[in-house]
Amino acid sequence: MAVSKLLRRRYIVLVISASALVLAGSASAGEGKIALGAKMYDKWFKVIGVPKPEDTHKSLPSSNSKKKGNATHRCKACHGWDYSGKDGAYATGSYQTGITGVRAFAGANPADVVAILKDATHGFEGAMLAGDMAAIATFVTEGQVDMDKYIDRASKKFTGDAAQGKEYYATICVNCHGADGMLPKDMAPLGEVANKNPWEVLHKVLNGQPGENMSGLRALPAQVAADVGAYAQTLPTE
């Protein structure tokens, strides 16, 4: 099915469900929109249900020869899980691009971010609906977490309370990830992921996993997610 047809179908669904979002209340709808935008920052094409891009994004710097295809169309691919781009975890490694992060847009006008998403560099106009871009803009301007408050950049260790995180994990996470973090089987052990890339884990614990039945903890204090991350780092890595 063509992307345009999928987008039209999604537009109808969004119109029908608009009243439900209003009835949910402005506060919860706001957190929900932020979490939606955060999941789209992660993997927008998975969230909106369109075919994943097959080409390499035209704006990926030629200096990066390690990444290609749909991975290069994800916001996080250049701007990072820590939202700091070249000044954060992506200063080195396979995702190094020299591109700046989005931290400077915290508190900015969402319309400015939408305009950037539509510009020639990003080229997302026509790839997603206006509401989708608005959700990303809401996350970028209103939903970024200062990850340096919860993760020590040098050691990659969460600064949360692992003992408290164990209690949260046992009541929120265990059914899907298992007591030892070894589920689902098609995912690397949670302990391994949490220790290798704590910024990704914090982003997903807060906002959820694109295309999966994983709810984010966005409506709760970010410290709860940091505590969960601290406990996850104690789980087996293999």
Which residues make up each language-model segment?
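Conserved small-residue-rich
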Residues: 159-209
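Sequence/structural segment immediately N-terminal to covalent heme-attachment motifs in c-type
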Residues: 30-81, 157-179
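N-terminal signal peptide c-region/cleavage motif recognized by signal peptidases
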Residues: 24-26
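Bacterial N-terminal signal peptides
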Residues: 13-22
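Extracytoplasmic electron-transfer domains, predominantly the class I c-type cytochrome c fold
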Residues: 32-34, 44-49, 68-140, 189-238
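Bacterial N-terminal signal peptides that target proteins for export
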Residues: 2-14
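Short, solvent-exposed loop/turn and secondary-structure capping segments
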Residues: 86-91, 148-151, 185
